[in-house]
């Protein structure tokens, strides 16, 4: 595209919406005239006639989906005949039925009073009948197609219709998607459920495609329907809101086009993996060469088959995205993967993590440099004319090595010598945050960074946060700044905290009071970081995979209840690996399945470690015994014994368990030959822990525990 079009897409979202309104969306008057004309034609086609047994007419194409561009567009009128008893009948009798439709329409043509101008065309000896409806600013050409009514009197699809579809395709050796027109009513219904602004985004993408067609060879071979579905997928996976940033939306679609070699898009609203015949159709389609975009109404219809056109569109998308600002990202887009984890075969999970979940190493190096500058600046400049001194340490997934490519979180924990205890006054914490906020602003202005450094607006008493973004990639990390009491003091590498560190905390612990479990976990950030940082790289990739899975669950289930924290799954992943594998290299699918099996069995979980605290101290021992007797699941933070991220009934583990159960049917847990992948053997063995001095032994039967100090195991 030329520079004028590139500048168009650089405009703010509100300008794009204005452009759509003024140039892309059909005028209301034109749309109304064409709608009235179409309704009249449909009524005529359904009038009783000796030669026609019409049971209904469906509206399809761009017209039926309500994605018509101003100017010239397309539509389909699907005429269902009652005497067509199976899919293949429409092919056998196409010539005959089109001839009858043509005769009926010509007979009635002179009596019609249409709001739009109509032109009938019958080409190639009645193998094609078209109706062109025109107004002053709009023209829509409708193909008229006879079809078998696959839905019958129902408004929904049925297993029978898809089984019969497969049988008919095999019988007449028709190409996949040959009979997709029979499901036009479902297609119309599918698009009717989406907000009008999403359809405006579709218009913008189709407009971009039209501009591409003007300069590309064979681009017409790709149906616009493929790009419409890709746009719906981008919105569903990345946004889902009725109101959104139009510029972000179009960037997201173009970035997906860039990744066309990995695209695999499908829906399960009309069909799913439950029936064996349909499942086999789906699996065959989803394992075909990319790109794959399945018609949500017909599982045999891959609408993205033309690879040549996709390569050309990829080139155009890359040119557009890179033409905006040299050496800088063209702007934010939604976080949408080109393929779903659910349909990724087990032997390809390592590649999935590498391609889609691991952060870019160059960006990670830039983050490390930026954090080094920021931490040094804060330590040198905060409270320069005061006795208060601070130490800044990094926490969260970035420093632990478990960050995702997008949406990663991290923390800067600020230890100040003015915070003398866990419960230091809140006004002292406020003063620290206020000073850090001022110095962060100074640091951002004075220092040069290889990344974008954005500080959020801070309003006390809310958390102070900032973001580091790549200037080239669609990657970023969000940081929270947390003032904390330095409970560990100058803890030497490899040593464990003094029991006194925890006994002071335990004395504050009152489950029924305002004290929140794990409220002071920031004080133990260094221990949390060290616990994970030393683990094998592949285990960190398993953690990434579980976090990605969790994010999908969170998006799906957020309206139904509060899910347990991601940290719980991180700890379960470590537990599963330590008890079930322990190898540096392992089968990713086996590890993934093992963790999901643990989630399913959440009502029996009791997981804890003794690397930083143990049963040796009496106060700690009594407290730990109380913790591990609590309602399951129990998953204790290895750095903070008051932090139970299992939480018993506190979170909706049952929702996560239900989702995990459904996922056991996914391709993730099938090997190359289609056989089920088994989980690791994580035993539910009797584990014994010592009671208080000489008081006997407390047994927990059929519970799952982990103690890195194996002296407590049977």
From Swiss-Prot:
Its cofactor is Mg(2+). The keyword Zinc does not apply. One of its GO terms (biological process) is negative regulation of viral genome replication. Residues 344-683 are annotated as: OAS domain 2. Its main location: cytoplasm. It comes from Bos taurus. Residues 11-336 are annotated as: OAS domain 1. PANTHER family: 2'-5'-OLIGOADENYLATE SYNTHASE 2 (PTHR11258:SF3), 2-5 OLIGOADENYLATE SYNTHETASE (PTHR11258). ATP binds at residues 397, 544, 547. This is 2'-5'-oligoadenylate synthase 2. Keywords: Antiviral defense, ATP-binding, Cytoplasm, Glycoprotein, Immunity, Innate immunity, Lipoprotein, Magnesium, Metal-binding, Myristate, Nucleotide-binding, Nucleotidyltransferase, Repeat, RNA-binding, Transferase. Produced as a latent enzyme which is activated by double stranded RNA (dsRNA) generated during the course of viral infection. The dsRNA activator must be at least 15 nucleotides long, and no modification of the 2'-hydroxyl group is tolerated. ssRNA or dsDNA do not act as activators. Strongly inhibited by copper, iron and zinc ions. Partially inhibited by cobalt and nickel ions. Interferon-induced, dsRNA-activated antiviral enzyme which plays a critical role in cellular innate antiviral response. Activated by detection of double stranded RNA (dsRNA): polymerizes higher oligomers of 2'-5'-oligoadenylates (2-5A) from ATP which then bind to the inactive monomeric form of ribonuclease L (RNASEL) leading to its dimerization and subsequent activation. Activation of RNASEL leads to degradation of cellular as well as viral RNA, resulting in the inhibition of protein synthesis, thus terminating viral replication. Homodimer. The lineage of its organism: Eukaryota, Metazoa, Chordata, Craniata, Vertebrata. Its EC number is 2.7.7.84. GO terms for cellular component: cytosol; membrane; nucleoplasm; perinuclear region of cytoplasm. Myristoylation is not essential for its activity. It comes from the Eukaryota.
